[in-house]
């Protein structure tokens, strides 16, 4: 380490065999509360990993650190073999290179619990905003692709409406289309169905299932046990900022080793 910079090289070290996402010994505190206590996780291209745990276990914080919406206190995050550089700032750790963070975010899309659509824009405008203004792609091309993506998630007929005129399930599907429009290598889902009425959950899960079948790399924080069992190829259970259980769905659901995970499963049936 030099000049106060951690995990930074001038030229990113990229390996063809590198995981799509790698998190090593990640730690994050808010004040005196340590939320992540040395979490490690690795996702290969095409992995669908469901991240389970009770409220406050650190699931969402981990996703937000991967996308640098929160800056970890220590640890290493690698996206496609490129290590995100951190350095000590006046208020704690900060990105060593904001342009690197911007580049990483263009490859790692996040779908939020609360949709995060821009209320003053139509659904179509929401989807094309970043491709046009961040990626500088031709507007006509972005519109054509956006309409295909909205068709894919089943709401192309809503393209000229504003978010407030859509149901929660439709808004979340629009948010997924917006994420896909950036051509991400990795998709992060932060409890994408928890804000929805029960009858709307299925329509969002169907879209997510189809994305998994396409071979997309997905990290999904969820309480949907059926999705975790049937769609994921790996399940990670966090408890108080630590990975308590990890493995294939058949293993962790069929013969859980952790007593806490057993209790968690029984409380979510």
Named regions from a protein language model:
Residues 18-249:
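ABC family nucleotide-binding domain
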Residues 2-5, 237-240, 250-269:
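C-terminal boundary and immediately downstream tail of ABC-type ATPase nucleotide-binding domains
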Residues 1-27:
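ABC-family P-loop ATPase nucleotide-binding domain
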């Amino acid at each position: 380490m030099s000049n106060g910079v951690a995990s930074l090289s001038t030229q990113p070290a990229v390996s063809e065999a590198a995981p799509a996402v790698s998190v090593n010994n990640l730690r994050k505190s808010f004040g005196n509360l340590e939320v992540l206590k040395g979490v490690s996780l690795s996702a290969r291209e095409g992995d669908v990993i469901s991240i389970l745990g009770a409220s406050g276990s650190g699931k969402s914080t981990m996703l937000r650190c991967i996308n640098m919406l929160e800056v970890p206190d220590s640890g290493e995050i690698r996206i496609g073999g490129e290590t995100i550089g951190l350095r000590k700032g006046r208020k704690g750790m900060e990105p060593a290179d904001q342009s690197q963070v911007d580049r990483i975010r263009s490859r790692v899309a996040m779908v939020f619990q609360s949709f995060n659509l821009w209320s003053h824009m139509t659904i179509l405008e929401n989807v094309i905003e970043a491709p046009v203004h961040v990626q500088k792609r031709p507007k006509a091309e972005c519109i054509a692709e956006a309409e295909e993506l909205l068709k894919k998630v089943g709401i192309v007929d809503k393209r000229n409406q504003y978010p407030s005129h859509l149901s929660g399930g439709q808004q979340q599907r629009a948010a997924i289309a917006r994420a896909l429009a950036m051509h991400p290598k990795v998709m992060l889902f932060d409890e994408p169905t928890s804000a929805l009425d029960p009858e709307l959950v299925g329509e969002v899960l169907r879209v997510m299932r189809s994305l998994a079948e396409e071979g997309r790399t997905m990290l999904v924080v969820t309480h949907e046990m059926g999705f975790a069992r049937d769609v994921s190829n790996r399940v990670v259970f966090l408890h108080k900022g630590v990975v308590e259980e990890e493995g294939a769905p058949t293993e962790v659901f069929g013969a859980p080793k952790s007593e806490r995970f057993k209790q968690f499963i029984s409380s979510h049936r």
